[in-house]
């Protein structure tokens, strides 16, 4: 994907306010101790109040915005489906401590293979650079995750050495086409970052200098604040603005599948007092503080691309988009590197869950998010949860699910197309226009109120993931996503809607 580098270091009007919020919350975190937290793995919507997010330019020929993140240890199983996603983007996380476990002894073998395979697939690779904890940082980790025993990150002992490592990464992988580098991952979570928001700002500033020294065309990306933390950022903004009823509505829409999963951290909320208590929780205060620090980096131009993580119900997307339209500078692109479906013990069938994949992905894209990467491509049956907490597009062995077929149909429709939102006469969704042809992915906003579309010449229709067939008489669109394809603009296809 083409990316426009933004290196404007002028202070924006919101920067001073963000620094005040981050500093105040940082003090609260220090007073509270901030040493515990849960790992983020990745009602009606709030009416939009911010300015619309900028429209997206056409995707270059043979590229599209629907990517995924997968376990490279199962590359062979996933390969047939990955070929269908050619033209998309993905990311891979590395750490200084894993690449250079002993000072001066770097091993790039695994990452070289990933970069080479990504290039062969035609999938753009983004790299997340973490420190973790080892000789380069000192200290003893409190958290060990996975079979690789990944640890939290912290500040380097020698910042110049850290910058040399970051520069090594950029110089090595620029020839593979890597242009976007995220610094750390979900730093709002203690198991990913041991340090203050101020220390994180210092680290990213140093990393950005090294990235641009090695490749002036490269783009620095934030850590990707967690999905849960973004939810608390959404409601904190509304509460601070005195929009209490909207805050309660947004909270219950956003967290409807999380309520009760973390005890008092994400409680049932029906009063503003309960919501204020939740916001004051130590973990949730940390979430908001690190979101403010991230936005300071964006406002200052240190970070040129905002990375969003979203694992919630599609009812929460409008509130997130409203937040982003209000808080994100208009010249800073947004990409969702982690999009998924968190639903512990979810009871939805394969079709309804697949349709939700379509709705969440297209709503984000229609709202101005230019990349959507689904996580996981296929879940790990041996995960510590012992169940599929986040829904995969594929079975663990690579067998394509209905969700995978639907997601692929979005990639086909979007390849090389111009994206625009659809919001007309009870229909919502997204439109992809390529040349003289348009494909719309739409559904009715009301569960029990179908919308009727009069067919235009050449109109083909069908469910997402299914073969499209010529439309005969009037087309009925329910609350289940449907594809409409015909010659002409999106407006001409929807010229007669009832």
Model-derived segments and spans:
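N-terminal substrate-binding region of glycoside hydrolase catalytic domains
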Residues: 47-170, 178-192
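Active-site groove signature of glycoside hydrolases
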Residues: 165-197, 221-231, 301-312, 336, ...
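Noncatalytic carbohydrate-binding groove/subsite architecture in carbohydrate-active enzymes
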Residues: 198-356
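C-terminal motif of bacterial Sec signal peptides marking the signal peptidase cleavage site
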Residues: 31-33
């Amino acid at each position: 994907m083409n990316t426009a580098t933004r290196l404007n270091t002028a202070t924006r009007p919101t920067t001073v306010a963000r620094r005040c919020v981050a500093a105040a919350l940082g003090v609260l975190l220090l007073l509270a101790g901030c040493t515990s937290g849960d790992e983020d793995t990745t009602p009606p919507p709030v009416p939009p109040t911010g300015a619309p997010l900028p429209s997206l330019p056409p995707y270059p020929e043979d590229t599209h915005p629907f990517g995924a993140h997968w376990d490279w240890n199962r590359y062979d199983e996933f390969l047939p489906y990955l070929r269908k996603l050619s033209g998309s983007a993905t990311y891979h996380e590395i750490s200084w401590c894993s690449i250079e476990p002993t000072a001066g002894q770097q091993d790039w073998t695994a990452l070289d293979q990933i970069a080479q395979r990504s290039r062969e697939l035609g999938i753009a690779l983004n790299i997340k650079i973490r420190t973790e904890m080892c000789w380069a940082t000192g200290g003893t980790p409190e958290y060990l995750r996975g079979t690789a025993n990944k640890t939290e990150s912290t500040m380097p002992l020698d910042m110049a050495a850290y910058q040399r490592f970051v520069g090594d990464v950029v110089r090595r992988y620029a020839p593979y086409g890597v242009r976007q580098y995220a610094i750390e991952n979900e730093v709002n979570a203690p198991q990913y970052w041991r340090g203050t928001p101020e220390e994180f700002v210092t680290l990213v500033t140093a990393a950005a200098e090294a990235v641009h020294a090695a490749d002036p065309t490269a783009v620095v990306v934030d850590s990707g604040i967690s999905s849960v933390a973004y939810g608390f950022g959404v409601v904190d903004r509304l509460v601070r603005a005195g929009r209490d009823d909207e805050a309660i509505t947004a909270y219950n829409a956003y967290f409807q599948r999380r309520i009760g999963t973390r005890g008092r951290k994400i409680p049932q909320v029906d009063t503003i007092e309960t919501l204020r208590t939740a916001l004051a929780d130590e973990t949730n205060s940390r979430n908001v503080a690190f979101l403010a620090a991230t936005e300071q980096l964006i406002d200052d131009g240190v970070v040129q691309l905002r990375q969003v993580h979203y694992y919630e119900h599609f009812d929460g997307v409008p509130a997130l988009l409203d937040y982003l339209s209000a808080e994100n500078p208009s010249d800073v692109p947004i990409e969702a590197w982690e999009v998924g479906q968190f639903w512990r013990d979810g009871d939805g069938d394969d079709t309804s869950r697949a349709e939700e994949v379509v709705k969440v992905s297209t709503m984000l894209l229609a709202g101005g998010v230019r990349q959507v990467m689904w996580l996981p491509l296929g879940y790990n049956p041996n995960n510590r949860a012992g169940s599929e907490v986040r829904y995969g597009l594929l079975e663990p062995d690579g067998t394509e699910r209905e969700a995978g077929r639907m997601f692929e149909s979005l990639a086909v429709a979007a390849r090389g197309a111009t994206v625009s939102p659809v919001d007309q006469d009870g229909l919502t969704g997204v439109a992809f226009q390529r040349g003289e042809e348009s494909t719309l992915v739409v559904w009715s906003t009301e569960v029990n109120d179908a919308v009727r579309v009069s067919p235009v010449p050449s109109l083909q229709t069908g469910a997402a993931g299914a073969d499209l067939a010529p439309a005969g008489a009037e087309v009925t669109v329910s609350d289940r996503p449907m594809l409409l394809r015909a010659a002409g603009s999106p407006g001409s296809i929807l010229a007669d809607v009832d």
